[in-house]
């Protein structure tokens, strides 16, 4: 994930997302907050970062969860702390991202 951007608006959005990773954030809410159309937000974000907003949030959440697990937290605690809707969706996303299970971290 490219987190460097010369676009001030994208830098502000990245900062907001990083501070609110555990909250549910819709594209429409994000667009309203930063006074952009939904299309312009999604297009500009992908152009500047190389990934979609959804994949950015998921990747950051999973990295945070992996750090928690490595620091001794349980898998279920990491799942809850990172804002995943269910344990099974967390495990599925974790396997896809890291090619291993959280217990093998």
Predicted feature residues:
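Alpha-helix N-cap/loop-to-helix boundary motif
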Residues: 2-5, 22-26
